[in-house]
């Protein structure tokens, strides 16, 4: 695809919900600072995350305070987006916010509620048979992105479950990287 990738090993919150976000924002700043050295276009640095990592990626894309903290785009795979107890992944919510979070904290980390016109363009992939993270997470995020006129694409598949990643499974979901490639070309993120 012609991309450079970095893997972030972020700290777990341990009752400090802001820690993963700070780690991800710091990583973005380091990559921007060293972009020339690494032959990277500092204006095209995006973020990608899957499942709970999708929640962190969507948090980075909706909780930035300045342009340097904002990724140029988001790629989200079967993401946990909301902290609403009826739609979230309970383990992700408990790990980030604790067992009895305040309504204010739930709202703050329900990223579909944090979308603005400044949220970066977003590509989302999810399967309808995901038994771990309900597809409503992705659908509600897409709706918020569209309401704020943020370029967004949600690609859904009937089968694939949770955690399909990029591996071949002999079912249509294995084609999602081609959908992503087309989206990235359309946005001139790759050639």
Short names for language-model regions:
Residues 2-9, 46, 153:
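A fold-wide structural signal in alpha/beta-hydrolase
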Residues 135, 139-191:
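C-terminal catalytic histidine-bearing segment of alpha/beta-hydrolase fold enzymes
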Residues 26-88, 106-107:
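Primarily recognizes the serine-hydrolase "nucleophile elbow" in alpha/beta-hydrolase
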Residues 4, 9-13, 80, 158-160:
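Short beta-to-alpha linker loops that shape the active-site pocket of alpha/beta-hydrolase fold enzymes
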Residues 79-114, 120:
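Mobile cap/lid helix-loop segments that gate and shape the active-site cleft of serine hydrolases
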Residues 118, 123-126, 130:
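Short beta-strand/loop motif that positions the catalytic acidic residue
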Residues 6-42, 170-175:
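Catalytic nucleophile-loop/oxyanion-hole region of alpha/beta-hydrolase
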Residues 83, 129-133:
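Acidic catalytic loop of the alpha/beta-hydrolase fold
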């Amino acid at each position: 695809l012609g991309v450079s990738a970095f893997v972030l090993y972020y700290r777990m919150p341990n009752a400090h919900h802001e820690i993963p976000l700070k780690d991800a924002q710091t990583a973005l700043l380091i990559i921007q600072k060293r972009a020339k050295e690494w032959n990277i276009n500092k204006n095209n640095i995006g973020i990608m995350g899957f499942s709970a990592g999708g929640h962190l990626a969507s948090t980075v894309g909706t909780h930035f305070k300045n342009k340097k903290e904002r990724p140029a785009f988001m790629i989200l795979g079967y993401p946990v987006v909301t902290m609403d107890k009826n739609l979230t992944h309970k383990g992700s919510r408990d790990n980030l916010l604790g067992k009895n979070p305040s309504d204010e904290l739930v709202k703050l980390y329900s990223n579909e509620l944090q979308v603005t016109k400044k949220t970066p363009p977003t590509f989302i992939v999810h399967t309808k048979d995901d038994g771990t993270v309900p597809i409503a997470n992705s659908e509600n995020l897409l709706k918020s992105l569209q309401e704020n006129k943020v370029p967004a694409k949600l690609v859904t598949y009937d089968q694939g479950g949770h955690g399909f990643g990029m591996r071949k499974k002999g079912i249509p979901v294995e084609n999602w990287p081609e959908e992503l490639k087309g989206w990235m070309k359309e946005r001139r993120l790759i050639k």
